Amino acid sequence: MAKKSMKNRELKRQLTVAKFAKKRAELKATIVNLNASPEERFAAVVALQKQPRDASASRLRNRCRLTGRPHGVYRKFGLGRNKLREAAMRGDVPGLVKASW
């Protein structure tokens, strides 16, 4: 189990990313727009750098919804490999069966 503080930190990051997503997209569009003046583009770069570090989506980490485990998480289910296996063995995941050949 991950510490509660790590889970809360990740939740806070998700909220920060959602809060700044629209503004970041606008600034990035200005930066890559070749029709904008160099001063406008530079101002957009500076504004983007002044935003909080956690506003970037690349700071997010996929974590297991049940345990908070950061590694071995299946995106499709949002669960870590251990909890996904347990859920599959209980029959909680429809259509998921253990491989046998």
Curated annotation (Swiss-Prot):
Keywords: Ribonucleoprotein, Ribosomal protein, RNA-binding, rRNA-binding
InterPro entries, A to Z: Ribosomal_uS14 (IPR001209), Ribosomal_uS14_bac/plastid (IPR023036)
Pfam families to which the protein is assigned, alphabetical: Ribosomal_S14
GO terms for cellular component: cytoplasm; small ribosomal subunit
GO biological process: translation
GO MF term set: rRNA binding; structural constituent of ribosome
Superkingdom of source: Bacteria
Family: Belongs to the universal ribosomal protein uS14 family.
Function, as annotated: Binds 16S rRNA, required for the assembly of 30S particles and may also be responsible for determining the conformation of the 16S rRNA at the A site.
HAMAP family xref list: Ribosomal_uS14_1
UniProt subunit comment: Part of the 30S ribosomal subunit. Contacts proteins S3 and S10.
Listed name of the protein: Small ribosomal subunit protein uS14
Protein species of origin: Pseudomonas entomophila (strain L48)
Gene, per the UniProt record: rpsN
